[in-house]
Amino acid sequence: WYKFANSLKLRMAMRTCYVAGFNVNGKTSQQLAEEAVAAGVMTAATDGAYRKVADHNPWQRFMVLWSDARISADLTCYMNAYNDPRREAYYDKSTFGTVSGNAYTGEESYVGLRRGILQGQYNSWSQGSSCMKVTTSDNIVVFRASEVAFLRAEGALRNWNMGGTAKDFYEEGIRLSFEENGITSGVENYLASTGKVEAYKDPLKGQSAQTYDYSGAINTNVTVAWSGGDFEKSLEQIITQKWIANFP
């Protein structure tokens, strides 16, 4: 609980860093963040905080049992571009592979549901998209050590005393996320990845009645491999990987 409280303090301090004049009892966001780290935050995958499910995991209920939601196309576009091994832990492969003319094969058979899908196409289109892997008894994620590492990476990028460099904490966050999701290989290749995110591809392209343009264009050129140098680009890398690691 002590590590959890300090980790939460670090998260709150980081979220206030852009608030002009912010302070608590005269302490700035930087001072509060440095206090939290010095007092001890979550550093190991086993430090993570989870809520035990008393009856039925809600993600399983509406994702699997009710089949009312699917993985976001935004997430799969990033993870496919980075050839992310965590896909197999996060969600299953789509069923579009059985559709004639489907462009998705092999590792690219992870297909998310884009925003703005027509309600009338629910059964014929959205049901084929990748679904979250979750069971009725899975615990609910509250706070993971990987997020703490990314928070420390952001702090270090701002030249706050986080106990290490932005690059080291960034890469540690990715390693912790792999461990938290049971992925035992591929992390070094992932850390060296220079793949860039591409626009969403319609898995049913060529079938005019079910082909959609995606207005949610992805505008980024960040890679997984740490670039260093430019503050905004490094910050985008940290936030992108934190977003992926914080699934769901």
Each language-model region and where it sits:
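Structured, solvent-exposed acidic/aromatic patches
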Residues: W1-G186, G228-E236, Q241
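C-terminal functional modules
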Residues: F178-P248
